[in-house]
Amino acid sequence: MPAVKVKENEPFDVALRRFKRSCEKAGVLAEVRSREFYEKPTAERKRKAAAAVKRHAKKVQREQRRRERLY
């Protein structure tokens, strides 16, 4: 859990914003959402593999667009 030390004469809103940002960077909310319901190991592997395929296709598409601009 991220911790934020409140500085002297620092407004609460600013400290809260820093805390939210540190939680976002640490991935706390994403972790909570992923652990909200049990996911079978096979379903998790399948989801991660599908995400990897999607990322790869996106990368290939970006590379093709970049090559088209060069000519």
Curated annotation (Swiss-Prot):
InterPro entries, per database record: Ribosomal_bS21, Ribosomal_bS21_CS, Ribosomal_bS21_sf
Domain of life: Bacteria
Gene Ontology CC, one term: ribosome
PROSITE patterns named in the record: RIBOSOMAL_S21
Coiled coil: none
Pfam families the record matches: Ribosomal_S21
Keywords from the UniProt entry: Ribonucleoprotein, Ribosomal protein
Region (Disordered): 48-71
UniProt biased composition (Basic and acidic residues): 60-71
Biased composition (Basic residues): 48-59
A Gene Ontology BP annotation from the UniProt entry: translation
GO molecular function: structural constituent of ribosome
Family: Belongs to the bacterial ribosomal protein bS21 family.
Protein's recorded name: Small ribosomal subunit protein bS21
